[in-house]
Amino acid sequence: MAVDTANEVKAIARYIRMSPSKVRRVLDQLRGRSYREALILLEFMPYKSCEPILKVLRSAVANAEHNQGLDPTQLVISQAYADMGPSLKRFRPRAQGRAYQIRKQTCHITIAVAPQV
């Protein structure tokens, strides 16, 4: 299945409070699939990360429809990746006056859609 990368449209969600590795687990399932297939998969996957990914996917398709005038039924996910965002640093009190650092990870989710040729 060939994809027209010249008309690629993307959407980005930044500072999502989730580990990038957990988001990548879902994105790896979506890459290369059609928009309709991806919607069905995201609806029934049992992962917490599906919700923000679904929002980004819908945003990318809305961008393609509004800005480029593309047909949503012809769109394929050409790129899908999650990059590391800044970590929120928290401390957990431990015995004898010590404290351990806890890093709450964030990520940036990017999804690009392109029409099928």
UniProtKB/Swiss-Prot annotation:
It comes from the Bacteria. One of its GO terms (cellular component) is cytosolic large ribosomal subunit. This protein binds specifically to 23S rRNA; its binding is stimulated by other ribosomal proteins, e.g. L4, L17, and L20. It is important during the early stages of 50S assembly. It makes multiple contacts with different domains of the 23S rRNA in the assembled 50S subunit and ribosome. The globular domain of the protein is located near the polypeptide exit tunnel on the outside of the subunit, while an extended beta-hairpin is found that lines the wall of the exit tunnel in the center of the 70S ribosome. GO terms for biological process: translation. SUPFAM superfamilies: Ribosomal protein L22 (SSF54843). It comes from Synechococcus elongatus (strain ATCC 33912 / PCC 7942 / FACHB-805) (Anacystis nidulans R2). Keywords: Ribonucleoprotein, Ribosomal protein, RNA-binding, rRNA-binding. Belongs to the universal ribosomal protein uL22 family. This is Large ribosomal subunit protein uL22. PROSITE patterns: RIBOSOMAL_L22 (PS00464). One of its GO terms (molecular function) is structural constituent of ribosome.
